[in-house]
Every structure is written in structure tokens, then in C-alpha cells.
UniProtKB/Swiss-Prot annotation:
Keywords: Cytoplasm, Lyase, Schiff base. Changing residue 189 to R: Exhibits higher activity toward DR5P. Decreases synthesis of CTeHP. Changing residue 188 to V: Decreases synthesis of CTeHP. This is Deoxyribose-phosphate aldolase. The gene is deoC. Pfam families: DeoC. NCBIfam families: deoC (TIGR00126). Transmembrane segments: none annotated.
Length: 226
């Protein structure tokens, strides 16, 4: 990323609201904020996609949705179906959670097939793969990134924001080293202020998942939440 100025930071942000109790009013506010501040996308649960798409019609802000979230432990066919249905409903990017248990068990072919099923369902829609790095050791993080690189996904992503902890600079740097320059790295979970956002980008992130986008682009202290 060539600039860390507010406009460039805004275009790196997926403005996020994934709470189970998120209301229509909150989603409408999320979308209005994304329009106002020029965020790249809003990131919402799949059931909120049609409403968010209507709110953002005519704007440059994209609708991103999560799949297999937050555990990643569902059937691969279910994840693929959810991705396809969510795209049909208006999603323009998909963030999926890989099967963490399979990865930790060393079932790498199964992990690959799980991601590949969703990737196929996405077609030309960019797919980000969430590793949930706080649950993995370094070798597992590396293997997950290698699989994602080999499959040609659009991004690898650190975290759901719903587990033990979120993105770290060390994990972002590791992921960037493994996937190389052609795949995006999304840092999510705990990115709540401009200093952290800039540090994540300097470490190799090209996208930030956060509910604190306004605090980041205005420099207004530390945001709360995701």
C-alpha cells in the first residue's frame, strides 16, 4: 500500500458488524458510515446481505459476508452452498473459516478440499480464508497459507474476532512471507486505532477487518468491539 493517509486507510477497511444480535438499524448505520468514510466494504453475516446490498446500492462500497462462521466446522458442502446463496443475495466478497480441527489434525487434503469447494462456489467473487491464528502453531499457520497460495484464493485472513485473540503483527508478517506478494493478507480482530492499523499494513496486511474504522480514519482514539 503506497499511502497510510486516511483515504488509503479507509480503502483498506472492511467495516464490520458480525454480532449475533445486530439489528437492521445497526446494519443501516454501518452502511451509512461506510459510504461517508469511503470504506472498501461492509462485512456482515449472510442473513444481512440483502438488506446491506440495498443500503449500499449505487455506492462504491462492497458487501462482504462470512461463511462457516465463526467455527469453520460445518460440512464443506454446507459452506459451499452458503457461499453460493450469499453471493446470489448480493455478496461481493466471501470470508470463510477453514476447518481448524482438520488443520490441527494434519488432514491437509481435507482442508484443501474444504477451501476448494467454497472457492469453486465463489466463481469470480474474491474468497478470503480465515485461519484463526490464535489456535494454531507456526507450522500450522504456514501450511494453511501454503494451501491457500496453491489454490489461488484472494486473501488469507488472521482471525474471526470471536476466539481467544485477534491479529498480531508477527502473524501478519508470517502470512505475508508465505503467501508472497500476489495474495492479500487481512488482519482482523483487535485492530482498533490508527497506530495498530498502520503497523498491520507495514507488517504486510492489505485489508483490515474492524468495527473501529471511524476511529482509525479520524484518529479519534481507540475504538471498541471487533
Amino acid at each position: 500500500m503506497n499511502s497510510l493517509e486516511p483515504a488509503a486507510l479507509a480503502q483498506a477497511i472492511d467495516h464490520t458488524l458480525l454480532a449475533a444480535d445486530a439489528s437492521r438499524e445497526q446494519i443501516a448505520t454501518l452502511c451509512a458510515e461506510a459510504r461517508e468514510h469511503g470504506f472498501y466494504s461492509v462485512c456482515v453475516n449472510s442473513s444481512q446481505v440483502p438488506f446491506a446490498a440495498r443500503q449500499l446500492a449505487g455506492s462504491a462500497v462492497k458487501v462482504c459476508a462470512v461463511v462457516g462462521f465463526p467455527l469453520g466446522a460445518g460440512l464443506s458442502a454446507s459452506k459451499a452452498s452458503e457461499a453460493a446463496l450469499t453471493i446470489a443475495a448480493g455478496a461481493q466478497e466471501i470470508d470463510m473459516v477453514l476447518n481448524i480441527g482438520w488443520l490441527k489434525d494434519g488432514l491437509f487434503d481435507e482442508v484443501r478440499d474444504d477451501i476448494a469447494a467454497v472457492l469453486q462456489a465463489c466463481g469470480k467473487v474474491p474468497l478470503k480464508v480465515i485461519l484463526e491464528t490464535c489456535l494454531l502453531d507456526e507450522a500450522q499457520k504456514v501450511r494453511a497459507c501454503e494451501i491457500c497460495r496453491e489454490l489461488g484464493v484472494a486473501f488469507v485472513k488472521t482471525s474471526t474476532g470471536f476466539s481467544r485473540s485477534g491479529a498480531t503483527l508477527e502473524d501478519v508478517a508470517l502470512m505475508r512471507r508465505v503467501v508472497g506478494p500476489d495474495i492479500g493478507v487481512k488482519a482482523s480482530g483487535g485492530v482498533r486505532d490508527v497506530a495498530t492499523a498502520r503497523a498491520m499494513i507495514e507488517a504486510g496486511a492489505t485489508r483490515l477487518g474492524t468495527s473501529s474504522g471511524i476511529a482509525i480514519v479520524t484518529g479519534a482514539g481507540t475504538g471498541a468491539g471487533y
